[in-house]
C-alpha cells in the first residue's frame, strides 16, 4: 500500500470516528473547524488521486447527478405497520392478550419502550459493512430507492464502525427533521420568497423525495434506527434492547430516550414521562412504541394481519383536529407586522380549546388556498401557538369568502407595505399607529426590558387610548392624580406604579438598548452591544463596519441598528428619557472573580422559580460561563429547575454535575 493510500485510509478512519462521536454519541472530541480541515485534506488527496476514491468515503455523501425518477425496491422482509392504542384500558387489553398467549404475568414481562418518531420509515442495507441501498417503507412490500439521498444525511454511517461486519445487515429506522432545523429551513424559504413547509414531517418527506441529492444534503435531516431486518453473518443479542445497543456500538444512531420497563405499570409511567418531555425534545413524536423485549418471545407471539402481536403504538391525544374558519382578523405588532389571525369554531386540540390560530402572513394564506367558511386542520404542539396546517378543499361551501389582505392598517389606516425579500407586510404608521405604540410601550415596561412593576398591558392600553402617553418618556411624566382617574387605579395602585417608574430610572445600558425595541435586537444582542461599545454615544455613532464587529451582529441586524439611530424621532425619545432621569453606569472592563462557573460550559433546563431563563443566562455570562443549549460530554454543569426533562436525564447518564436552582442562587449571591 502506498504512502498516499495510507494517508487517505487514515483520514477516512479518523473522520468516521469523529462522525460517530458527534452524531451517535453526541460527544464531539474536536471542534467543527478541525473536522472541516481533515475533511478538506481528504478531499484534496482524492481529487489528486481519483483512482483511490471509494463509495464509502466521507467525501462521497453528495455528488451524484439528479435522478429522472425513483426506482422501486421490493423489501425482502415486509416493513409492517403497528396496531395503535389510545388509552390505558386498550394497553392493558394488549398486555392481557400477550399474557394469554405466553402464560406470563404482566408484572414479569419486560418491554423495550421507545418514542414514536413522527417521520418516515426507511430501510438501509449494509453489505460487508458498506451502505449499498436505502428504501422508503412504501406500502410495506415495495418502496422507493432513495439511496443517493440517504447517503447525504450526516448521522448515517456510509461504513459500519466494526472490523467484523455482517455479510448483510438491514437496519430500519425513522428519518425526521428536528424542530430547530425545520424553523431555519422555513425562515430561509420565507427570506427567498418561497413556500414554507407546514410541519417537520412534511419537510422531511419533501427533502427525502428530492430528485437532486444536493438539495437533500442541504436539509437538516436525522435518522434513528429502531429495528433490524435482514441479518446475515451476524451473531445478534437475544433481546431487542441489546440489539439497539449493538447497533449503536457499530456506528448506527439510536434514539436516546429508549428505556427498558418491566411490567405494565412501569410502561405506562414511561408513556407519561415521555409525554411530559415532549415539548422540549426538539423533534416531533406522536406517541410511544412498546415492544416485548425478548426476541424468543417475539417469535412465539408472531404476527397478525400486517402487524406484530408483540408490539403496539400507544398514541398521544391528537394534536391536529378539524374545525371551521369563521373569520380572519388582522393584528398589528410592535414593529408594524401585520399578522392574519384565524377566528375558528372552537375545537378541543391536545387538551386545550382552540378558537384562534395564526395564519402567519399573506404567502401562507395563498399557499393554503384558504377561504372563510372552509373546513381547516388545526395543529397545536406543546406551547406553540396553534396554526392552520391544511384545508379540506372538498368541503368548501358555496358561500365561502376569499380572504383579502388589507392595503391599509386596520388601526391607523396608514399604508401597508411589503419590502422585497421579506414575507411580512408592515404598517408604515410607526408610532403614529396606536397598535404599534401600545406594543412598543408594553415591551419597554416588560420585565426583561425596563422591568417596571405595576405598569402592565391593561394600564398601557388605557394610557394610550386616553392620549395620556405617546412615547416611553411620557411614562415618567405621569402623576398621581392622572393615574387615579383611570379604571381600577386607586391611590395605592397609582403610587405603586409611580414608585416603580422612579426605581426603573436606574437601569443598565443593556436593558435600555433592549427596551428601545430595535428590530432584531434581543436581550443577548443588547448585552453584546453594551459590552462592546461601553456607552450609548459610541453605539449611536457607530458605523456599519463597527456594528458588524460585535458578536452575533450580522449585516441585517447592523443595518437595523444603524437606521434606528439615523431617525431623529428616535434620538428625541432617547434624549427625553435621559432628561426624565433615566440613567445607567457605563460598562467597565471587569475582571471576573474566581467562581464555580468561570470558563465552564453550563446548560439550563426546567423552569426556574426565582427568575427567567434569560436572566439566569445573563448572570452566568457575567460570571464568565459559556451557556449552551444542549448537554454533551463537554458540559460541565447542568442547572435544573422544576420539570427538568431530557437534558437532566442525559446529564445524569453522562455523569455531568447537576445543580439545583437554590444552589445556583446561593453561588450567585455569594459572588455578586
UniProtKB/Swiss-Prot annotation:
The gene is ligA. The active site is at 116 (n6-amp-lysine intermediate). One of its GO terms (biological process) is DNA replication. PANTHER family: CHROMOSOME TRANSMISSION FIDELITY FACTOR 18, DNA LIGASE. Belongs to the NAD-dependent DNA ligase family. LigA subfamily. Zn(2+) binds at residues 409, 412, 427, 433. The keyword Ribosomal protein does not apply. This is DNA ligase. Residues 592-672 form the BRCT domain. NAD(+) binds at residues 32-36, 81-82, 114, 137, 174, 291, 315. The keyword GTP-binding does not apply. Transmembrane segments: none annotated. It catalyses: NAD(+) + (deoxyribonucleotide)n-3'-hydroxyl + 5'-phospho-(deoxyribonucleotide)m = (deoxyribonucleotide)n+m + AMP + beta-nicotinamide D-nucleotide. Its EC number is 6.5.1.2. DNA ligase that catalyzes the formation of phosphodiester linkages between 5'-phosphoryl and 3'-hydroxyl groups in double-stranded DNA using NAD as a coenzyme and as the energy source for the reaction. It is essential for DNA replication and repair of damaged DNA. Its cofactor is Mg(2+); Mn(2+). It is an enzyme of class 6 (ligase). One of its GO terms (cellular component) is cytosol. One of its GO terms (molecular function) is DNA binding. Keywords: DNA damage, DNA repair, DNA replication, Ligase, Magnesium, Manganese, Metal-binding, NAD, Zinc. InterPro entries: BRCT_dom, BRCT_dom_sf, DisA/LigA_HHH, DNA_ligase, DNA_ligase_AS, DNA_ligase_CS, DNAligase_adenylation, DNAligase_N.
Amino acid at each position: 500500500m502506498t504512502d498516499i493510500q495510507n494517508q487517505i485510509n487514515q483520514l477516512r478512519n479518523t473522520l468516521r470516528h469523529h462522525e460517530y462521536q458527534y452524531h451517535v454519541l453526541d460527544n464531539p472530541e474536536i471542534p467543527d473547524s478541525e473536522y472541516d480541515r481533515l475533511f478538506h485534506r481528504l478531499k484534496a488527496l482524492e481529487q489528486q488521486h481519483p483512482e483511490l476514491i471509494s463509495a464509502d468515503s466521507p467525501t462521497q455523501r453528495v455528488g451524484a447527478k439528479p435522478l429522472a425518477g425513483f426506482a422501486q425496491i421490493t423489501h425482502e422482509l415486509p416493513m409492517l405497520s403497528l396496531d395503535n392504542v389510545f388509552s390505558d384500558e386498550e394497553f392493558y387489553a394488549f398486555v392481557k392478550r400477550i399474557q394469554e398467549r405466553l402464560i406470563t404475568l404482566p408484572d414479569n414481562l419486560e418491554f423495550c419502550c421507545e418514542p414514536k418518531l413522527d417521520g418516515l420509515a426507511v430501510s438501509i442495507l449494509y453489505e460487508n459493512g458498506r451502505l449499498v441501498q436505502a428504501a422508503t417503507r412504501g406500502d410495506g412490500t415495495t418502496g422507493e430507492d432513495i439511496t443517493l439521498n440517504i447517503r447525504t444525511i450526516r448521522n448515517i454511517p456510509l461504513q459500519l464502525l466494526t472490523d467484523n461486519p455482517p455479510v448483510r445487515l438491514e437496519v430500519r429506522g425513522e428519518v425526521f427533521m428536528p424542530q430547530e432545523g425545520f424553523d431555519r429551513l422555513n425562515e430561509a424559504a420565507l427570506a427567498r420568497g418561497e413556500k414554507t413547509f407546514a410541519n417537520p414531517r412534511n419537510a422531511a418527506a419533501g427533502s427525502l423525495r428530492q430528485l437532486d441529492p444536493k438539495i437533500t444534503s442541504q436539509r437538516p435531516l436525522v435518522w434513528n434506527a429502531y429495528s433490524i431486518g435482514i441479518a446475515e453473518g451476524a451473531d445478534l443479542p437475544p433481546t431487542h434492547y441489546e440489539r439497539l445497543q449493538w447497533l449503536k456500538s457499530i456506528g448506527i444512531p439510536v434514539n436516546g430516550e429508549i428505556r427498558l420497563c418491566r411490567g405494565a405499570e412501569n410502561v405506562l409511567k414511561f408513556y407519561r414521562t415521555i409525554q411530559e418531555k415532549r415539548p422540549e425534545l426538539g423533534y416531533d413524536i406522536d406517541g410511544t412504541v412498546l415492544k416485548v423485549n425478548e426476541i424468543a418471545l417475539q417469535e412465539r407471539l408472531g404476527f397478525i394481519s400486517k402487524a406484530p402481536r408483540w408490539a403496539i403504538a400507544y398514541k398521544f391525544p391528537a394534536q391536529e383536529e378539524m374545525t371551521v374558519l369563521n373569520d380572519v382578523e388582522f393584528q398589528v405588532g410592535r414593529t408594524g407586522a401585520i399578522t392574519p389571525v384565524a377566528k375558528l369554531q372552537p375545537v378541543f386540540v391536545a387538551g386545550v380549546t382552540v378558537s384562534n390560530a395564526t395564519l402567519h402572513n399573506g404567502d401562507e394564506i395563498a399557499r393554503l388556498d384558504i377561504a372563510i367558511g372552509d373546513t381547516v386542520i388545526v395543529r397545536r404542539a406543546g406551547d406553540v401557538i396553534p396554526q392552520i396546517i391544511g384545508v379540506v378543499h372538498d368541503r368548501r361551501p358555496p358561500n365561502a369568502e376569499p380572504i383579502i389582505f388589507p392595503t391599509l392598517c386596520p388601526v391607523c389606516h396608514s399604508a401597508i407595505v411589503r419590502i422585497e425579500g421579506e414575507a411580512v407586510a408592515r404598517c408604515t404608521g410607526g408610532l403614529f399607529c396606536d397598535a404599534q405604540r401600545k406594543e412598543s410601550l408594553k415591551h419597554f415596561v416588560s420585565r426583561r426590558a425596563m422591568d417596571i412593576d405595576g405598569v402592565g398591558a391593561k394600564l398601557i392600553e388605557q394610557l394610550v387610548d386616553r392620549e395620556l402617553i405617546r412615547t416611553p418618556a411620557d411614562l415618567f411624566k405621569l402623576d398621581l392624580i392622572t393615574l387615579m382617574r383611570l379604571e381600577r387605579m386607586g391611590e395605592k395602585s397609582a403610587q405603586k406604579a409611580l414608585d416603580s417608574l422612579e426605581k426603573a430610572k436606574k437601569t443598565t445600558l443593556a436593558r435600555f438598548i433592549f427596551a428601545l425595541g430595535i428590530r432584531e435586537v434581543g436581550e443577548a444582542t443588547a448585552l453584546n452591544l453594551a459590552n462592546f461599545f461601553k456607552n450609548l454615544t459610541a453605539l449611536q455613532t457607530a458605523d456599519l463596519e463597527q456594528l458588524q464587529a460585535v458578536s452575533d451582529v450580522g449585516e441585517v441586524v447592523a443595518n437595523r441598528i444603524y437606521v434606528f439611530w439615523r431617525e431623529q424621532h428616535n434620538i428625541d425619545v432617547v434624549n427625553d428619557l435621559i432628561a426624565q432621569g433615566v440613567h445607567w453606569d457605563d460598562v467597565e472592563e471587569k475582571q471576573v472573580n474566581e467562581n464555580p462557573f468561570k470558563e465552564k460550559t453550563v446548560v439550563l433546563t426546567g423552569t426556574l422559580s426565582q427568575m427567567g431563563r434569560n436572566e439566569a443566562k445573563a448572570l452566568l455570562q457575567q460570571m464568565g460561563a459559556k451557556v449552551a443549549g444542549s448537554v454533551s460530554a463537554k458540559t460541565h454543569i447542568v442547572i435544573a429547575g422544576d420539570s427538568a426533562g431530557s437534558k437532566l436525564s442525559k446529564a445524569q447518564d453522562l455523569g455531568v454535575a447537576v445543580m439545583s436552582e437554590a444552589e445556583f442562587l446561593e453561588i450567585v449571591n455569594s459572588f455578586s
